[in-house]
Amino acid sequence: MAHKLLNDTFLRALLRQPTDYTPIWLMRQAGRYLPEYNATRGRAGSFLGLAKSPAYATEVTLQPLDRYPLDAAILFSDILTVPDAMGLGLEFVTGEGPKFVRPVRTEDDVARLAVPDIDATLRYVTDAVREIRTALTDAQGRQRVPLIGFSGSPWTLACYMVEGGGSADFRTVKSMLYARPDLMHRILDVNARSVAAYLNAQIEAGAQAVMIFDTWGGALADGVYQRFSLQYIQQVVSQLKRDHGGEKVPVITFTKGGGLWLDEIAETGVDAVGLDWTVNLSKARERVGGKVALQGNIDPSVLFAPPASIRMEARAVLDSFGNHPGHVFNLGHGISQFTPPENVAELVDEVHRHSRAIRSGAHAPA
């Protein structure tokens, strides 16, 4: 599959096909733990200056690949580009994170929401996808690794849109959810249609897999999650292009704190489910029964440990999954900005080394 790809291990793993080793990429792999990223961000002048420049986005997307033999690149962007395109006025305040100038709080605010014109408002993202694909490809037309596109989930975007930024307790958005579920469903429907259009635009531009980040799904109660997050993830997935240019485009979804709902998430039509570090990978594999691939799920804090400990914990994750197709190694959440870059090299090397040993029979998982 994926002709001209020098390394298609990641895509094959997502489709539960046999691979010679377990592929690895890291959430937030292009980020502040890398000095070269910080240098580029300094030149860009701000985070938004970085994210909205296809040239800078391409530069930082490739930085971790130049350091480590990772098996996929992920578009450098931010999940809040979609509500920004809806006119909410995204700002990044130093020390406070993202803020929206015009949060969605009233019935009138909700009534004004509409699916943005992706080509007009988010062209910088699709341009970045095209530029990254070009930068990943050599003079002979051979691409190093696949490129992942992504978006936030409808619910996670709604959290930021209603709260006006990050939140410790989601009081404002949950108040709306329980007091005015009609308004919340309207927001989520607009978000779902927007996310589907956005991801399809990324696929058309050259993204070879896409991921839906449901970062705050785990903040919801059982039963509420299904109605206000999972239902809308399924709506997005049902609208996605699953083939482009004769190749399958796998879809991954990740609900942080969503281990409780693994069986239901696996029924949404996605190809792979991301797991955080609280989930037992062996039991998760048994639960989904080969229906989907699994991605994850080492604790990002392991990367603060000495190299021997990092390697031991990586082996434990690989042994837990065992010698089966359908595993993409990743962190259970995004990499910390305080991670020593040299420790990432230890992790990537051990994942490749130990998974090859498992495949060859030189090491039998417990």
UniProtKB/Swiss-Prot annotation:
Substrate binds at R28, Q29, A30, G31, R32, D78, Y160, T215, H333. Keywords: Cytoplasm, Decarboxylase, Lyase, Porphyrin biosynthesis. One of its GO terms (cellular component) is cytosol. It catalyses: uroporphyrinogen III + 4 H(+) = coproporphyrinogen III + 4 CO2. The record marks D78 as: Transition state stabilizer. Its EC number is 4.1.1.37. It is found in: Cytoplasm. Pathway: Porphyrin-containing compound metabolism; protoporphyrin-IX biosynthesis; coproporphyrinogen-III from 5-aminolevulinate: step 4/4. It is an enzyme of class 4 (lyase). One of its GO terms (molecular function) is uroporphyrinogen decarboxylase activity. NCBIfam families: hemE. Homodimer. Belongs to the uroporphyrinogen decarboxylase family. HAMAP family: URO_D. This is Uroporphyrinogen decarboxylase. It comes from Paraburkholderia phytofirmans (strain DSM 17436 / LMG 22146 / PsJN) (Burkholderia phytofirmans). The gene is hemE.
